[in-house]
A protein has these predicted regions:
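Sec-dependent signal peptide recognition
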Residues: 1-6
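C-terminal motif of bacterial Sec signal peptides marking the signal peptidase cleavage site
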Residues: 12-14
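Ser/Thr-rich, low-complexity intrinsically disordered terminal regions
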Residues: 16-151
Length: 151
């Protein structure tokens, strides 16, 4: 009788196994990264700035070594972020994506960082990195799409 109850419970709950997500690549830093053969930092910087603009993000910084964008996030995500990062007394919350570009001979090594941050009273910055496999795979797939080589 006990086994029938367990089987019935499993049937009602949907004994479906959760999909296991595998990373697209294992990188030295643990963040999405790639090497672009024979590409200058300047051309890649422009590519990443255009990508940010297409996402509707505000470009905070653009140089040959870094492109940093402030992503537009919904009020719901902002509320969740405030609750997760601190009390209700804080500055507006921001979600950033940053492309770091490092010259290696004729090649450029790119590492992508993504995080949420806010400033609490007293000036302290609280930051939470986006480090889920969903984010990681999306960013790594983007690097693959625009012509990267594995690290």
């Amino acid at each position: 009788m006990r086994y029938i109850f367990i089987l019935a419970l499993c049937a009602l709950m949907g004994c479906e196994e959760k999909e296991v997500i595998e990373p697209l690549a294992i990188t030295p830093s643990g963040w999405p990264e790639a090497i672009f053969k024979n590409k200058s930092r300047k051309s890649l910087s422009e590519t990443f700035a255009v990508h940010c603009a297409k996402l509707g993000a505000t470009i905070v910084e653009e140089s040959e070594t870094r492109v940093k964008c402030d992503e537009n996030i919904s009020e719901g995500v902002k509320s969740w972020g405030r609750a997760f990062l601190c009390t209700g007394h804080s500055s507006d919350i921001h979600a950033y994506i940053q492309f770091n570009l490092i010259k290696r001979g004729a090649d450029t090594h790119v590492k992508v960082l993504n995080w949420m941050q806010l400033q609490i009273p007293g000036g302290q910055i609280r930051r939470k990195d986006y480090n889920t496999l969903y984010y990681y795979n999306d960013a790594q797939a983007y690097l693959y799409k625009i012509g990267r080589q594995p690290v």
